[in-house]
Structure formats: C-alpha cells, structure tokens
C-alpha cells in the first residue's frame, strides 16, 4: 500500500537546530529508500518540509518508520499522512484485442 506524508517544521526551533541534525536526517532517508519503504522524496517549495511517497503494509508501519527520523524524534517536525489508492481512470475499459 502507498502513502503520502507531508511534513513541516514546528515553531520554536531555530535554523541551527535543523542544521545540526540534517546529515543524520538525510542518512535515515537514504536507509529507508534503500530498504524500499520510501519511493520518492520532494522538498516543499511553499515552506520548509518534505513530501515522501511510502510503500508499506499499513499506516502504523509508516508512522513507526517516520518516527525514526531525527527531526521527528526531536519533536521538530509534524506530519500529515495520506493513504493512497490507484487511480481508476487508467484501468482498461475494453478487453484487449486478440491477435489472429
């Protein structure tokens, strides 16, 4: 199952707080990507934060993995998690043509 997480920084933390944990945060993202849990990552342009496309068995698994990020462990980020389902408009509407 796929999920989209949308995170943003919490108020009350300085830029230096994020800078101190940035390398650890990126390393954890690389690990989860290599393990196949993270499919894609985007930085947000509207505010500091990120959007991640996850592949997991369920919402609880994503929340557990997200909680392993250094920013999450320090309470510096908050996250909205959206479960996704395939777009129905791409399914075939007619049976495939048979070759003769």
Language-model region placement:
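Conserved, structured core segments of small domains
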Residues: 1-100
